[in-house]
Amino acid sequence: MDLTEFIKICRLLYDRKYVVGSGGNVSIRDGNLIYITPTGLSLGFLTKEDICIADLNGNIIKGKPTSELNMHLKIYQNKDSINAVVHTHSMYCTAFSALDKKLKLVTPEAEMVVKKIAYVDYFPCGSLELAENVSECIEDSIILKNHGIVTLGKDITEAYIKTEVLEEVAQLNYIMNNLK
């Protein structure tokens, strides 16, 4: 499988500071397999050799995947149309989530791309409760209390664009709140 776009998106997430350090994780589905980022490695320095592989039952074929593997698996198991998951700790979305503030979709692009946002209460990172609550959301753009966002797409580019637009929405909401 060609993972060039996967690596490109991971580096974009890092370069645009949607993730810092070794935070965040990304996966794509290819049939019964998922390709997922490893634990403890910065997305900005990811190579093809670093990418982990698991099957949809959670059997690890290669590498040591992110602690959020269960969240990715549950999403794929519950949503046949989803082939990519992006989880970031983007600054503005995370700040709004920590304050329990809902975001207004203020631009036409946000209405078209994000459509509607789901909000999930806080559950510990990597927990089965987090995985189950995220995977039960109907929406493809999800804000996690104190923990960033998850965006879903038919491919990795679509999931990435939702991340980018959702973080812009949070920035615009911040600006609007401070201009009042």
Curated annotation (Swiss-Prot):
Cellular component aspect of the GO annotation: cytosol
Oligomer status and interactors: Homotetramer.
Uppermost EC category: lyase
Record carries keyword Zinc: yes
One Gene Ontology term from the biological process aspect of the record: pentose catabolic process
Reported function: Involved in the biosynthesis of the coenzyme F420 which requires phospholactate produced via the aldol cleavage of L-fuculose 1-phosphate and the NAD(+)-dependent oxidation of (S)-lactaldehyde. Catalyzes the reversible cleavage of L-fuculose 1-phosphate (Fuc1P) to yield dihydroxyacetone phosphate (DHAP) and S-lactaldehyde.
Record's catalysed reaction(s): L-fuculose 1-phosphate = (S)-lactaldehyde + dihydroxyacetone phosphate
Gene: fucA
Source species of the chain: Methanococcus maripaludis (strain DSM 14266 / JCM 13030 / NBRC 101832 / S2 / LL)
Cofactor(s) listed: Zn(2+)
Residues at which substrate binds: 24-25, 39-40, 66-67
UniProt protein name: L-fuculose phosphate aldolase
Residues annotated as the enzyme's active site: 68
